[in-house]
Amino acid sequence: MVSSKDIIQRRARRVRRRIKMVSGNRLRLSIYRSNQNIYAQIIDDLRGCTLVSASTLDGDLKKSLKSGSDKEAAFAVGKLIAERAKKAGVNEVVFDRGAYVYHGRVKALAEAAREGGLNF
């Protein structure tokens, strides 16, 4: 019997494998979703460093949100990561959803980043 933990790990490996095949030399927009917050960062895998990051724990954003764990918070993080990416000169990324299903907060963050000007 396959456990749910194994299923999640398989899904994450499958997504990362597809990203490696498709991405070329593009940067990666990676997200992490906890029960109370959501985090996003743009990573350069060739250099092994994070260029830009945003989360619901950022000072200005935290004050303006009533909760860090809803779609509105994810949308705000998506807008913020896109704005910071533009300042850093990043326009094209590959969306790395990890093991998370493209639904709810993950989808809201992705759509906000697209609206903010990121292409993926």
Curated annotation (Swiss-Prot):
A single cellular component GO annotation: cytosolic large ribosomal subunit
Pfam families, per database record: Ribosomal_L18p
GO molecular function: 5S rRNA binding; structural constituent of ribosome
KW Ribosomal protein (keyword) present: yes
Biological process (GO), any one: translation
Keywords: Ribonucleoprotein, Ribosomal protein, RNA-binding, rRNA-binding
UniProt cross-references to PANTHER family, sorted A to Z: 39S RIBOSOMAL PROTEIN L18, MITOCHONDRIAL, LARGE RIBOSOMAL SUBUNIT PROTEIN UL18M
Function description: This is one of the proteins that bind and probably mediate the attachment of the 5S RNA into the large ribosomal subunit, where it forms part of the central protuberance.
Subunit structure and binding partners: Part of the 50S ribosomal subunit; part of the 5S rRNA/L5/L18/L25 subcomplex. Contacts the 5S and 23S rRNAs.
Listed NCBIfam families: L18_bact
Family statement drawn from the similarity comment of this UniProt entry: Belongs to the universal ribosomal protein uL18 family.
The protein's name: Large ribosomal subunit protein uL18
Species of provenance: Bartonella henselae (strain ATCC 49882 / DSM 28221 / CCUG 30454 / Houston 1) (Rochalimaea henselae)
Upper taxonomic lineage: Bacteria, Pseudomonadati, Pseudomonadota, Alphaproteobacteria, Hyphomicrobiales
